[in-house]
Amino acid sequence: MAYYRTPHDVTALPAWQALKDHRQAMQDFSMREAFNADPQRFNQFTLSSCGLFLDYSKNLINAETRNLLVGLANEVDLKGAIKALFDGEIVNSSEGRPALHTALRRPVGDKLSVNGVNVMPEVHKVLNQITDLVGRIHDGLWRGYTEKPITDVVNIGIGGSFLGPELVSEALLSYAQKGVRCHYLANIDGSEFHELTQKLRAETTLFIVSSKSFNTLETLKNAQAARAWYLAQGGSEAELYRHFIAVSSNNAAAVAFGIREENIFPMWDWVGGRYSLWSAIGLPIALAIGMSNFKELLSGAYTMDQHFQSAPFEQNMPVLLALLGVWYGNFWGAQSHAILPYDHYLRNITKHLQQLDMESNGKSVRQDGTPVSTDTGPVIWGGVGCNGQHAYHQLLHQGTQLIPADFIVPIVSFNPVSDHHQWLYANCLSQSQALMLGKTLPEAEAELRDKGMSEDQVQKLAPHKVIPGNRPSNTLVVERISPRRLGALVAMYEHKVFVQSVVWGINAFDQWGVELGKELGKGVYNRLVGSEETAAEDASTQGLINYFRGRHRG
């Protein structure tokens, strides 16, 4: 029976008990000692695939740990789950849908059926539609209401319609096509809208409204504001079609807004928002970096799909990262995971992975609705490079919580300045090294004595300089951030999240928790503006409504 039809209690599996026993045996495991004892440890726990190099040797593991974790993957039938995902089975049980974001990067000629229909021709038809639009804009053939070419594209969307495209278009800024600037408008905050439109001219701006339903509150409000701004700047209703296109499955609503049918790019219910950057949601990416680079992005993701499906689990990058996350979250008590990119252009990867991981695996019931019996997804957080070293890395080094980390770093910078990149790379490696090595009390005391301190001073200060070490991390190295390697990197994290959902028996492809706040928000809004006089469901919310109404002006 498929994993999503009969979810298991993972804690009842023999492999889980074996890992519990192994965890006790690893209580006094020291990475420092493990490296000293085994000169081959680095070679034993590194892996290269799809343009990515993974060093996972700085983890609280040995060969037995890896074997036991792979045994757990086998007991939950991970192989069958991967096949179900790629074959288009109904892995999203609560919504009765497959999750086929991987279809978006499959090559021409592949076949994949959904409800008896081969979807691949439609996938490539839309890709051709994107190619045509991108070509017309880059060639200056798409013109605004004053017949000037488009110079700015604004993507109006939130969540998966924003985070993935923003990550990729900024990460690949070095591949940006001249003549077209891409911007993102997501939050329902007038200040964001104001600051953005200050930079734009309506006559040369194209808005992409990205919303599957064409009814997402934040997106619709921003689209309406953009429409009003366009008209106020001199645009006309008759020429509106030149300045607004849509990515949506609600054609009727988009047409009613003023968008022409031929300028509506479809979305499919078998692609979730946080997995959608490979689809027409990626239009701003293609406009930013060009169509050939966008196809390279898809190709890189496809190579990771192939690796994920074919590599043995002990040599499978997404599988190993997922199992390490299970190891720390379920057996070492880790509650969060840090993503630490040492690259300015990758500064938004943490935001994308927050949605990808936390919206997917922030679940407390299994696929069949029964409660989970163990912790599931961690809090994902982090930030870029050396900035974090002067902020929150202190907690990683000397705090009381175990927080695994992923360091992501390129070997080559697109913008070399003196020896900056060598220092950046050195800082990345030294941070992972410091997390692993730490500093013992005798080492701290010796260091202070070498500085000429009195013994009394040494004894007072040394405990503050002790760093526990033995803190786990992975290091992901790429030669240089390119469309292909970035595609592989993002797809790797998608598959990592899926593997963990299989282990825990949860649904990685729904997000019912997001819906409750939306539903309650309507009632709160109606009370704020006075169209609903009944009190809110609780005194705190009503009190805050009253506070707003008593003070709000304008």
UniProtKB/Swiss-Prot annotation:
GO biological process: gluconeogenesis; glucose 6-phosphate metabolic process; glycolytic process
Keywords assigned: Cytoplasm, Gluconeogenesis, Glycolysis, Isomerase
Pfam family of the protein (one): PGI
Enzyme kind, highest EC tier: isomerase
Compartments where located: Cytoplasm
One cellular component (GO) term of this entry: cytosol
Family indicated by similarity: Belongs to the GPI family.
Alphabetized NCBIfam families for the sequence: PRK00179.1 (NF001211)
PANTHER family associated with the record: GLUCOSE-6-PHOSPHATE ISOMERASE
Function: Catalyzes the reversible isomerization of glucose-6-phosphate to fructose-6-phosphate.
Name the record gives this protein: Glucose-6-phosphate isomerase
Source organism (scientific name): Pseudomonas fluorescens (strain Pf0-1)
Lineage: Bacteria, Pseudomonadati, Pseudomonadota, Gammaproteobacteria, Pseudomonadales
